C-alpha cells in the first residue's frame, strides 16, 4: 500500500475558455461529449496536488477514466509566509507541472482566458475566497482543495457565492476515495453501526484545528457514516493527539483520532451488523483525480454541498468542545446558528 508521504517524495524526485457564463454545466457537458476537445483546466497555486494532478491529467497514455480533461495553465499567487512552501519545494512543483506541459501564467485573468474550469490548489484556506471569486464570476466550475477556508464562516461564504453565481463547486479529500471506504459507501452504508478512523492531524494556528490536516480522517469517517451527526465532543487533546466522538442518528457512534506523535498513517475500522472491516490506508491521488474529471465533465459534484458543510461544522464543533474542556457540542444547533440547512 502506497504511503502518502512516500508518494509526495517520489513525485518531487521524478519531476513528475471563456463563454461559460450563460450555462457552465450544459456547456461543459457539450464539450466533453463525442469527439470534442478535452476540457482545459487551470490551476491556482503551486503545491503537491498541482504537481500530482498535472502528471495524471496530462499523461498522453492515460486511461479512459481520466480522459476529457487536461491542465492547460497555472497561476501561483504570493502566499502567506507562515504557511508557504519553501523556495526549493516550489521550484520542484514548478518543474513537474512544466514537464507535464502546463504553462505558468502571470495573473488570474490570463489563466481564466485560457481555461474552462479551475482547481484552487493553494494549501492555505485564508485566501481561497479571494481566489475563487473571479472564477465564479467568470462562470467556470471550480474544485477547491482542502481546506476550503480557514473557518466555518469562510467555507459557507464560498459555497454561498457558488450558489449565487450558479456555478458548480466540488471539494474532497483523496482519502474519501480509497477502495474500502467507497465499497462501504456504495453498498453497505445502511449496515454501518459505527466507525473509528485516524489520520495525521498537524495543526496550523491560522485555521480551525482539524481543517488543516485532520480533515483527511474526518472525511473517511463521513464517507462510511454519512451525514446526520447530532453532537460531538473532544475527549482528548494534547501535543500529540486529538480524540473526538460523534453521535449520529440511531445512536451510531463515530470516533476520530488525529495523530501528531508516533507513527503517522491513515486508516480505520467500520463496525456493521455482520462484519468488521478495516478501511486501509492512502491509495494515491488517482482515485480523486478520476472524480475531478467526472465533476468537470458532468458539472455535478460527487459530494453534496450539505455533506461538505456538515464535515466542516463537525470539525468546528469539535474545536468548540476542546475550548470548553470536552463538553458536548450540538452539530445540529451549530448548523442552524450558521444558517446551514438541516
Regions found by a protein language model. Give the residues of each.
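N-terminal glycine-/serine-/threonine-rich beta1-alpha1-beta2 phosphate-ribose binding loop
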Residues: 2-138, 163-164, 237, 324, ...
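A general structural signal for well-ordered alpha-helical segments in protein cores
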Residues: 50, 181, 217-218, 285, ...
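Hydrophobic residues in well-ordered beta-strands that form the structural core
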Residues: 106, 144, 169-171
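Aromatic/hydrophobic pocket-lining residues that form π-stacking "cages" and hydrophobic walls in ligand
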Residues: 131, 158, 317
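Short helix/strand-capping hinge loops at secondary-structure junctions
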Residues: 139-141, 146-147
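A contiguous active-site-proximal alpha/beta segment in oxidoreductase catalytic domains
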Residues: 148-207
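Rossmann-like dinucleotide-binding domain that binds NAD(P)(H)
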Residues: 195-263, 306-309
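C-terminal active-site/capping subdomain that shapes the small-molecule cofactor and substrate pocket
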Residues: 267-342
Amino acid at each position: 500500500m502506497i504511503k502518502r508521504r512516500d508518494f509526495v517524495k517520489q513525485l518531487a524526485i521524478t519531476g513528475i475558455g471563456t463563454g461559460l457564463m450563460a450555462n457552465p454545466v450544459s456547456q461543459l457537458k457539450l464539450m466533453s461529449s463525442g469527439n470534442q476537445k478535452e476540457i482545459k483546466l487551470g490551476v491556482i497555486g503551486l503545491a503537491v496536488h498541482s504537481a500530482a494532478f498535472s502528471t495524471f491529467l496530462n499523461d498522453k497514455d492515460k486511461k479512459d477514466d481520466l480522459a476529457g480533461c487536461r491542465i492547460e495553465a497555472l497561476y501561483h499567487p504570493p502566499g502567506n509566509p507562515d504557511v508557504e512552501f519553501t523556495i526549493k519545494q516550489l521550484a520542484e512543483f514548478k518543474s513537474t507541472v512544466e514537464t507535464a506541459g502546463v504553462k505558468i501564467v502571470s495573473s488570474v485573468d490570463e489563466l481564466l482566458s485560457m481555461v474552462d474550469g479551475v482547481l484552487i490548489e493553494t494549501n492555505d484556506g485564508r485566501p481561497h475566497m479571494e481566489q475563487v471569486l473571479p472564477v465564479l464570476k467568470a462562470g467556470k466550475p471550480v474544485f477547491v482543495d482542502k481546506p476550503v477556508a480557514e473557518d466555518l464562516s469562510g467555507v459557507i461564504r464560498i459555497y454561498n457565492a457558488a450558489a449565487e453565481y450558479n456555478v458548480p463547486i466540488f471539494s474532497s479529500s483523496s482519502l474519501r476515495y480509497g477502495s474500502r471506504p467507497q465499497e462501504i459507501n456504495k453498498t453497505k452504508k445502511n449496515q454501518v453501526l459505527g466507525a473509528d478512523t485516524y489520520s495525521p492531524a498537524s495543526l496550523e494556528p491560522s485555521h480551525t484545528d482539524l481543517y488543516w490536516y485532520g480533515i483527511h480522517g474526518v472525511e473517511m469517517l463521513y464517507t462510511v457514516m454519512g451525514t446526520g451527526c447530532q453532537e460531538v465532543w473532544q475527549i482528548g487533546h494534547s501535543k500529540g493527539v486529538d480524540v473526538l466522538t460523534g453521535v449520529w442518528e440511531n445512536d451510531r457512534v463515530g470516533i476520530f483520532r488525529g495523530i501528531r506523535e508516533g507513527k503517522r498513517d491513515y486508516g480505520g475500522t467500520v463496525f456493521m451488523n455482520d462484519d468488521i472491516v478495516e478501511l486501509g490506508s492512502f491509495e494515491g491521488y488517482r482515485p480523486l483525480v478520476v472524480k475531478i474529471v467526472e465533476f468537470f465533465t458532468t458539472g455535478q459534484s460527487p459530494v453534496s454541498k450539505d455533506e461538505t458543510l456538515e464535515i466542516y461544522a463537525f470539525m468546528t464543533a469539535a474545536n468548540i468542545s476542546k475550548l470548553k474542556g470536552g463538553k458536548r457540542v450540538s452539530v445540529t444547533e451549530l448548523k442552524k446558528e450558521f444558517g446551514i440547512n438541516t
